[in-house]
């Protein structure tokens, strides 16, 4: 029996490793190829699956045993990527440099996330029939949607793509997704992944946890379900391909951030989070997260909704490190000192306040006065009551793709403050000509614009000139004005990451 060959990138990450372990269960159906960086840690971990006992016997570039192949290389090296892609029927591509690492090295994030994805596309194009026999699953991010605090926390595919200010990770994922959608590949999908709840939760203790507003609505997925869903793409039907999806664990995995903090801090032995953290340590806006209104669409294909929020907490409880027990007996005063050191680091909100970092204060709080006005825990202001509302996409979404016409595209362009310059609409994949409100002309398929929420690449961040864009683009303004004033006028430069190094 001839097996399909599957390339998996990012096998050392949370989603990727879960996918790797799931693929191992299906070796009767698939040969496995990994593209893995040749670090000592990776070599020790992955070579045991090759049956190699001594690291000294490992080939420097490629090892292959019984249908399991490891290409030791890097996404940013086109030759390494081609060696991995060559001969594969499927490419599962979750590899990425994520935050907070991406915040500190946005140039490397762009190389890995964007240029690396372009290398994957190019390698597929070099295959037989220009890659028409190879299917690509690209993993995007909920971060592409940007700041979606209530009442706009209900997210759908097709909503505006607006990365939060300073979120360099999101900007690279957006650029990479655009490249995938417009690649011309016959078989592709983009899966916008939500927050992955990992068992080793203490490893997430980082200043970035304070960037998240307490009222943020979030819908997580466990690492096992994320990896399982990724591998399930291998069995997806023809109608699955050529689309964009939101991936999460479903409604049973929804929560509000302050609730998650309460449960997680208790679970980790830290007790009442209000005793170890001050309320004004947390930002008021400018992160990402929401509840996916349409994640059921992907689950209908992949059937990956297997775990709920309680299952996640059970996994965390099972993986608690020894020092989580020690925390229980340490006076909470010392725990608070430890956490305050975190929030006072260069990427921490209190450091921005004390150093008068105008850009960060403006982006994450609105103003220093608004930070000063944050009440104590005694005042209940972190809850949101109400269902929120869905965003308008600028055209009749009740129409099937086959029912859309040129006037629908022109209507959508007008709602974005621009124009559709083309006078002929062929299909959802064929690129058309558009113009944005600032006069930039560009090409993009209806799938990219109407179904993906993308718009003008010249206006894409970085830099972030959102106040001017929102003034001319009603589609964009739906998100931006939900927690920004229409009198704001601020510009955030592309090099603004340097003030947190």
Language model features by range: what are they?
Residues 61-115:
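NAD(P)H-binding glycine-rich loop region in Rossmannoid oxidoreductase-like domains
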Residues 76, 104, 108-119, 163, ...:
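Glycine-rich NAD(P)-binding loop of the Rossmann-fold in SDR/ketoreductase-type enzymes
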Residues 4-26:
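N-terminal Rossmann NAD(P)H-binding glycine-rich loop of SDR-like oxidoreductase domains
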Residues 229-296, 300-389:
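Mid/C-terminal beta-alpha module of Rossmann-like enzyme folds, strongest
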Residues 373-501:
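Functional cation/ligand-contacting sites centered on basic and imidazole/sulfhydryl donors
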Residues 97, 118-166, 189:
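Conserved Rossmann-fold NAD(P)-dependent oxidoreductase catalytic core, especially the SDR/UDP-sugar
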Residues 111, 144-188, 211-215:
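Catalytic helix-loop patch of NAD(P)-dependent Rossmann-fold dehydrogenases
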Residues 211-235, 242-243:
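Substrate-positioning beta->alpha
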């Amino acid at each position: 029996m001839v097996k399909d060959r599957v390339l998996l990138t990012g096998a050392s990450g949370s989603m990727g490793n879960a996918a790797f372990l799931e693929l191992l269960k299906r070796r009767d159906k698939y040969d496995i190829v990994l593209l893995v960086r040749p670090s000592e840690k990776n070599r020790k971990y992955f070579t045991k699956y090759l049956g190699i006992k001594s690291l000294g016997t490992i080939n420097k570039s490629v090892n292959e045993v019984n249908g399991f192949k490891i290409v030791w290389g890097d996404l940013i090296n086109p030759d390494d990527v081609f060696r991995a892609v060559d001969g594969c029927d499927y490419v599962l591509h979750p590899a990425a440099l994520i935050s907070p690492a991406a915040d500190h090295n946005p140039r490397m994030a762009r190389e890995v996330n964007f240029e690396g994805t372009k290398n994957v596309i190019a390698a597929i194009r070099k295959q037989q029939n220009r890659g028409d026999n190879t299917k690509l699953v690209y993993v995007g991010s909920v971060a592409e949607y940007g700041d979606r605090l209530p009442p706009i926390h209900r997210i759908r595919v097709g909503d505006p793509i607006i990365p939060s200010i300073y979120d360099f990770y999101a900007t690279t994922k957006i650029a990479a997704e655009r490249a995938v959608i417009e690649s011309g590949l016959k078989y592709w999908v983009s899966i916008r992944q939500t927050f992955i709840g990992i068992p080793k939760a203490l490893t997430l203790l980082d200043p970035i946890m304070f960037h998240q507003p307490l009222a943020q609505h979030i819908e997580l997925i466990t690492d096992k379900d994320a990896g399982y869903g990724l591998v399930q793409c291998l069995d997806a039907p023809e109608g699955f391909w050529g689309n964009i999806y939101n991936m999460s664990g479903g409604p049973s995995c929804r929560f509000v951030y302050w609730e998650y903090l309460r449960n997680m801090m208790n679970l980790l032995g830290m007790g009442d989070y209000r005793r170890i953290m001050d309320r004004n340590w947390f930002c008021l806006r400018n992160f990402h997260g929401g509840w996916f209104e349409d994640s059921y669409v992907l689950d209908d294909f992949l059937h990956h909704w297997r775990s709920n929020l309680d299952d996640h907490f059970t996994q965390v409880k099972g993986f608690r490190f020894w020092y989580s027990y020690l925390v229980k007996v340490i006076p909470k005063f010392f725990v608070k000192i430890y956490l305050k050191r975190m929030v006072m680091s260069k990427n921490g909100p209190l450091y921005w306040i004390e150093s008068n970092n105008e850009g960060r204060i403006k982006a994450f709080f609105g103003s220093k006065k608004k930070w000063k006005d944050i009440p104590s825990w005694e005042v209940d202001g972190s809850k949101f009551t109400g269902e929120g509302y869905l965003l308008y996409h600028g055209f009749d979404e009740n129409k099937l793709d086959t029912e859309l016409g040129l006037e629908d595209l022109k209507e959508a362009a007008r709602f974005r403050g621009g124009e559709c310059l083309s006078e002929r609409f062929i299909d959802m994949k064929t690129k058309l000509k558009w113009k944005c409100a600032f006069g930039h002309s560009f090409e993009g398929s209806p799938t990219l614009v109407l179904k993906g929420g993308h718009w003008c690449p010249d206006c894409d961040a970085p830099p972030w000139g959102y106040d001017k864009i929102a003034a001319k683009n009603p589609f964009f303004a739906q998100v931006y004005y939900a927690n920004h004033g229409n009198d704001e006028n601020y510009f955030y430069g592309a090099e603004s990451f340097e003030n947190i190094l």
